[in-house]
């Protein structure tokens, strides 16, 4: 089987859609080496270079021309006799020849429709047009959670039979053991507290960092935050200054993937009170890192967290505070939930996800 992919996110995105693209190709190429996997893009980058070193993974430059991703990439995939074209980020090429090829698209979320206030009018219109067009063209749609599947049915009016839920995994570095020496070196490099709670993700309104900060106000609980800052950060910063919490909250930037994995392992608790997610990869990363999770009781987050994570109302910082204190002051409960969470998260291991993907690929042909 020859599978072609839209490689834009694989080569261009550092996190999010980039990680999804690289992990998907990596696990397929590793678990099913008999197939051929071809990544199309106008150019390649250093991202994912170790995956491209695999003998069954290759890069193919898209034909030149304006809007080549939209108008040339699909035809290029047909030209090399690909059996399947998989759009990894909610889009498919617009132009195809009559040559047979099956089309699959992954839709991660429809947050721009569910929470339109976070997006400009122009972005909402463009995203909606692209996603609706891809959903109509596709022979099958991968949704990364049951929540996303429900949204696709509701907003894009796609029949349920056309949608398959295939969960995401996470980078293998979060599943690897790390030496005490390395962990201590990271602790020293970033001057981390002896004990702390952790939050990972873009610092934006939807991720709800401000309610974590409000929850620890008045408590001697250090918070470490890792994520890209947006304009929302100013609101958080203003609250920190007003309440003299600057020394209690530590913001880290330019953290490598290996360092991030170490910081997860050093944390006591992972706190993720997001208002909405397509799936919630940081929850999976935390569970693989064997730390207990506190997350929202809405959206897809219970799918990612399992029954032994602790759930909160993201709108209620007093609820967040109570759940943080519950785990912070109870070592045996932290350990129990971390162990149960680690057992649960094995459903998202590479082999299970690769098998689910390949079963759908085979069925569509």
In which residue ranges do the predicted regions lie?
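Carbohydrate transferase catalytic cores enriched for Leloir-type hexosyltransferases
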Residues: 1-365
């Amino acid at each position: 089987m020859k599978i072609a992919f839209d490689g834009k996110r694989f080569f261009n995105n550092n996190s999010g859609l980039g990680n999804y693209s690289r992990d998907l190709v990596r696990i397929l190429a590793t678990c099913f080496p008999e197939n051929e996997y071809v990544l199309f893009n106008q150019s390649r980058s250093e991202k994912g270079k170790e995956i491209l070193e695999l003998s069954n993974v290759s890069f193919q430059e898209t034909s030149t021309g304006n809007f080549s991703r939209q108008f040339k990439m699909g035809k290029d995939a047909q030209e090399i006799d690909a059996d399947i074209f998989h759009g990894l980020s909610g889009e498919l090429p617009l132009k195809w020849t009559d040559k047979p090829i099956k089309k699959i698209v992954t839709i991660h979320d429809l947050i721009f429709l569910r929470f339109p206030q976070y997006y400009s009018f122009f972005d909402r219109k463009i995203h909606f047009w692209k996603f609706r067009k891809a959903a109509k063209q596709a022979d099958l749609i991968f949704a990364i959670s049951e929540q996303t599947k429900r949204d696709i049915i509701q907003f894009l009016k796609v029949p349920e039979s056309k949608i398959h839920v295939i969960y995401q995994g996470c980078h293998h570095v979060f599943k690897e053991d790390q030496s005490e020496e390395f962990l201590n070196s990271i602790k020293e490099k970033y001057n981390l507290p002896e004990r702390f709670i952790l939050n990972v993700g873009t610092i934006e309104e939807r991720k709800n960092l401000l309610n974590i900060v409000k929850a620890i106000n008045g408590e001697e609980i250090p918070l470490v935050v890792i994520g890209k800052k947006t304009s929302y950060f100013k609101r958080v910063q203003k609250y920190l200054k007003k309440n003299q919490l600057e020394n209690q909250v530590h913001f880290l930037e330019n953290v490598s993937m290996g360092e991030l994995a170490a910081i997860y392992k050093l944390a006591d608790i992972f706190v993720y009170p997001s208002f909405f997610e397509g799936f919630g990869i940081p929850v999976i990363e935390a569970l693989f890192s064997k730390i207990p999770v506190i997350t929202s009781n809405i959206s897809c987050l219970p799918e990612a967290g399992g029954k032994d994570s602790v759930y909160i109302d993201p709108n209620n910082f007093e609820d967040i505070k109570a759940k943080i204190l519950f785990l912070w002051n109870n070592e045996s409960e932290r350990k129990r939930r971390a162990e149960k969470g680690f057992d649960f998260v094995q459903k998202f291991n590479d082999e299970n996800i690769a098998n689910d993907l390949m079963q759908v690929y085979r069925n569509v042909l």
